UniProtKB/Swiss-Prot annotation:
It is found in: Cell membrane. Signal peptide: none annotated. Transmembrane segments: none annotated. This is Dihydroorotate dehydrogenase (quinone). Binds 1 FMN per subunit. It comes from Rhizobium etli (strain ATCC 51251 / DSM 11541 / JCM 21823 / NBRC 15573 / CFN 42). One of its GO terms (molecular function) is dihydroorotate dehydrogenase (quinone) activity.
Amino acid sequence: MIDPFQRLARRGLFLFDPETAHGMSIAALKSGLVPACQIAPDPRLRQTIAGLTFENPLGMAAGYDKNAEVPEALLKLGFGFTEIGTVTPKPQSGNPRPRIFRLVEDEAVINRLGFNNEGHEAAFRRLAELTGTGIFGVNIGANKDSEDRIADYVAGIRRFHSVARYFTANISSPNTPGLRDLQARESLAALLSAVLAVRDEMAEKSGRKIPVFLKIAPDLTEEGMDDIAAEALAHPLDGLIVSNTTLSRDGLKDQRQAKEAGGLSGVPLFEKSTAVLARMRKRVGPDLPIIGVGGVSSAETALEKIRAGADLVQLYSCMVYEGPGLPGTIVRGLSALLDREKAGSIRALRDSRLDYWAARKV
């Protein structure tokens, strides 16, 4: 439940257009105006996934801190990890404004940002200055005008290898024309081969092998899911992130804003993304890590992602509506749910509703 102070702050931010409000929230985190969340560590929430130890399973998804401006401040809100980006080799301005739209009745957001970011060098400089031991992932993408998109992903691995705790290859944004074509099997095989080869090359030189995750779309056919699963298992990929935003507008109340082009995120994405998550878990088996994203708005929805097959979960859009207290509320709520379930660990509940979600309509 959003507290009165956060409700007032949200009302103030909602007086501004979404992109301006986003910039104001980044500025507030930079300045220390947002209070840190005090959460007692719960060893039942701690997991080691892809060689990394996460104090709790909740992460901030990519898209909020595009330029690595506030990763440590985000961890202080209660997140167990955070993901910066998407970053591209060269700076780019993205698509014309307006390009973010609130669907308040639906607690959803439509964006067509188009990988607006300051480029590799700006993000690298900021990450190199961090002194903490938190888990910061780097979400890498390709420039819109790139003549060799796979080379852009390879460049991201090379540039951030010394500062990233994990990588995410984002091939599923709907806002860069042709990007989702990299999910097609032949293209995906070429991408994974190139990215993982340079990751292994850098590991030999540095002694640090950085996990690589692949972020996929929710708008996949069954054949598309088959192909991605097959290639994920055929390469030494460290995990999947399921899922990015959707092009679907099914069931929305705000039909005026629903007409805007772009990817939909927030509460309406929960069902679809969770069903795709479960289908992918069925396809890749029990061992490949999966991070579940899409519509996480509470401890209950976070746990439901885990029951559907996720090891970790991420959120972003729902914090637009619930405020910066949401991560702490969810983490405390997960501990309470483990008490209720009499579960010794969060891992013990993974896959407990896998069959239910895998059978749901996508």
